[in-house]
């Protein structure tokens, strides 16, 4: 028997989570949390694979993404709030524990679930981001930077410069991405250049450039050169 991927909504008094699901409702849940800038559909290949292996595979749009609740205040995106969303999602599907899989910005969320709600975990998997006990924040990750690639005098925040830009320019950063959503997606998801391997990442220049797209604060209209 093959299980389809379905669209679902979990509502509480504080939040709405849209999520995709595949598999038997009574099976052990494995919940996939995406990073930035992604959506639940980023897990479109994993959901049917694990759903048809005997798990109940789920992938939510995280807070602020897609069809889940979107908030305008910076503090509404604190890890405490995002973790609360995931615990409510677990309650909504009527289970006590899940296997949590996080990628990129989803990784700090799954680690925080394990730290603060171990009773809601069968296991935790982190892709791309290691476990950092002190928390995934600029103050803890900047000191771990590779200073051969990012000399401190030129790149004080290393590849994490973009995080400081977001923190200090939340409204402007949001406006820049929203000014032309289609162009933003094309710009951020265009294919990388192999010549950039081993060189400072674009994320290290965001404050100096006054944003991802410079002073214009809107994405250029780049062509689509690859489709997935």
Each PLM stretch: what is its role?
Residues 3-5, 17, 67-97, 101, ...:
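Flexible "cap/lid" subdomain of the alpha/beta-hydrolase fold that forms the substrate-access gate
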Residues 6-12:
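Short acidic-hydrophobic surface loop/beta-edge motif
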Residues 9, 45, 179:
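Short, well-structured alpha-helical interface segments that form or flank functional binding sites
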Residues 12, 62, 129:
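Active-site donor-binding loop signature of nucleotide-sugar glycosyltransferases
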Residues 12-22:
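A short loop-to-beta-strand scaffold at the N-terminal edge of the catalytic core in hydrolase folds
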Residues 20-70, 89, 103-105, 116:
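Conserved HGGG/HGGXW glycine-rich cap/lid loop of the alpha/beta-hydrolase fold
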């Amino acid at each position: 028997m093959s299980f389809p991927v379905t669209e679902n909504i979990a509502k509480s008094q504080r939040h709405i989570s849209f999520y995709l699901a595949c598999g038997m409702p009574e099976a052990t849940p494995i919940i996939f949390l995406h990073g930035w800038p992604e959506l639940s559909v980023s897990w479109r290949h994993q959901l049917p694979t694990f759903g048809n292996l005997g798990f109940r595979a789920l992938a939510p749009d995280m807070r602020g993404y897609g069809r889940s609740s979107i908030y305008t205040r910076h503090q509404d995106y604190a890890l405490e709030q995002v973790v609360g969303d995931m615990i409510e999602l677990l309650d909504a599907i009527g289970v006590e524990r899940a296997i949590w899989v996080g990628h990129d910005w989803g990784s700090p969320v799954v680690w925080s679930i394990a730290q603060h709600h171990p009773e809601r975990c069968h296991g935790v998997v982190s892709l791309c981001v290691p476990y950092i006990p002190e928390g995934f924040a600029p103050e803890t990750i900047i000191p771990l930077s590779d200073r051969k690639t990012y000399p401190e005098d030129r790149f004080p925040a290393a590849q994490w410069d973009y995080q400081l830009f977001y923190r200090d320019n939340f409204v402007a950063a949001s406006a820049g991405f929203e000014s032309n959503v289609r162009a933003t997606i094309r710009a951020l998801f265009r294919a990388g250049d192999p010549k950039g391997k081993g060189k400072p990442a674009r994320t290290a220049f965001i404050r100096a450039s006054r944003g991802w797209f410079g002073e214009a604060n809107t994405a250029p209209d780049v062509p689509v050169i690859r489709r997935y």
